[in-house]
């Protein structure tokens, strides 16, 4: 499996817009890829978000990304997303990982396992 992790800061009063954008982006990505995304909001800094997405493999991701990036709606949504970033913390960090393994406790109940 292939994992992408993004970190960024969203203006605290624009979180609803952020979530709406992410929902639209997910629908577009879903046309091309199978994926699972988790959005984490820091308990210490309400503006800090981490986005973790798991894909089947990097090759499938790279091949699909070519088509996704040609979609005008994706370009427009990315511009909208950038407008939600904090002015003084407008950087988006991105890192790639290979998924190695996971462990799960049977006592933890959640919506979906990552």
Residue ranges and their predicted role:
Residues 93-114:
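Acidic/histidine-enriched, glycine/proline-rich intrinsically disordered or flexible terminal extensions
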Residues 3, 62-63, 100:
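A beta-strand edge to alpha-helix "cap/lid" segment located at domain peripheries
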Residues 3-8, 50:
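Active-site-flanking beta-strand signature of metal-NTP-handling nucleotidyl enzymes
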Residues 38-42:
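Short, solvent-exposed loop/turn elements at beta->coil junctions and helix N-caps
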Residues 44-47:
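Short acidic/glycine-enriched loop/turn segments that link adjacent beta-strands
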Residues 24-37, 54-93:
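An amphipathic, aromatic/His-enriched active-site/gating alpha helix that lines ligand/cofactor pockets
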Residues 9-20:
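Short, surface-exposed ligand-recognition loops at beta-strand->loop->(often short) alpha-helix junctions
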